[in-house]
């Protein structure tokens, strides 16, 4: 496959990914099941590497940290007791990570509040619509859907890969096709226009060839970044749907 890297602002670092997993899995941040969160984290990082996304070294450092915490949590009781005399009080191996996550969550919440206030100030200089009923209805419908992040998209892509591996027949000959990202983007836009409706994310992956799967996913990320598509998800872990934005339907 042609080497291609996608850099998107959504990738804010390993703490952001961990917080995403905690929220999506509805985990108590003060009592993190390390084995579960480590497994999910490593799966995401592996998928990001397969997609040739720009995975910073800090993601790998966090992976090592999680594995270290996991191993300490699995220490037999007898081994734990050997260290008790050297410690003033028993420490939870997760404490430092939990503290960092709580601080990061505060920072992220504050940043979100500042952004919302800035958007509100910008709206104050525009003329509001005379009839707000339709506008209010639209907002209400939008709020019923989750805010879909790139991490959600990676999770959905993981499911696609798993299904393709299960259904993929044995092949004696492998044909390698290099597909430009731009061409796949145009094909997706054309499909959305032809369908005239929102389509399921999985419908974009008819091929079983890994190169085609990866290029398709990268094309979706680019369309997201360019605001050419709208991503919707009704609830955690449910299907993701894609709709063309006004920019492509008006073209």
Swiss-Prot record:
One of its GO terms (biological process) is DNA replication. GO terms for cellular component: cytoplasm. Keywords: Cell cycle, Cell division, Chromosome partition, Cytoplasm. It comes from the Bacteria. Its main location: cytoplasm. It holds the Pfam family SMC_ScpA. InterPro entries: ScpA (IPR003768), ScpA-like_C (IPR023093). It is found in: Cytoplasm. Belongs to the ScpA family. Component of a cohesin-like complex composed of ScpA, ScpB and the Smc homodimer, in which ScpA and ScpB bind to the head domain of Smc. The presence of the three proteins is required for the association of the complex with DNA. Participates in chromosomal partition during cell division. May act via the formation of a condensin-like complex containing Smc and ScpB that pull DNA away from mid-cell into both cell halves. This is Segregation and condensation protein A. The lineage of its organism: Bacteria, Bacillati, Bacillota, Bacilli, Bacillales. The gene is scpA.
